[in-house]
């Protein structure tokens, strides 16, 4: 089944697309995950900790293109993380790659279709709070969607979720506290703040950084917000963690680069991996 990744995918089209995706995955694995984990730029090493895993390249799944962003391997994996069945995305799809919002969120919706009820989203982000230097880990307490897009535009799929989705607690308070508890147990410093999602792929100007900070943002990136909207629409609980890879434009006086993002991910990735592994191990069974 071939799809153009630029073709709009309204919510009403998602059930049929998810049927095809689920069938393709089930042809390779019958594992029913409890948790879904999305690994952002430079954070893919957690996938190395999976056991009994099955790896499926994005391009092998119907309608999904290969991931093109550096630091995103572009694989869906099913396996055991410290004895807990999980589904993991080693990389993600972005709108700046030319993908429709409905396609960008399909991986998270597929995680729910496969059985995961808890979704952990990670990303690399720029720091808006001057106190959040490179290497800071931040639990996402709330977000501001400045992409100008939503995955819920168009006829609804009532079988998945409501027409009008409440986002009061988009990031589940109980899961946020569990992340903080896991970080304390691992002696990892973990902050909390507001994530602002932009379209990308350009980094922000210094003037935009000042504006976003004035709006209450603590970190800024090019992902996550649409995935959270779709996950909450599908009745999934969401936790999010940003790795601040660089100060916002204008703070340091240095130009920004994706190489800097990947290097920070390599340095801080092991700390984040320890927190997520403990979080997953200690998550109560449904």
Language model features: what each stretch is:
Residues 157-168, 214-217, 252-265:
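Glycine-rich tight-turn/loop motif centered on a GG-T
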Residues 160-171, 183, 197, 209, ...:
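Polyanion-binding loop/helix "lid" in catalytic or ligand-binding cores
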Residues 249-286:
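His/Asp/Glu-rich mid-to-C-terminal helical/loop segments that flank catalytic regions of hydrolases
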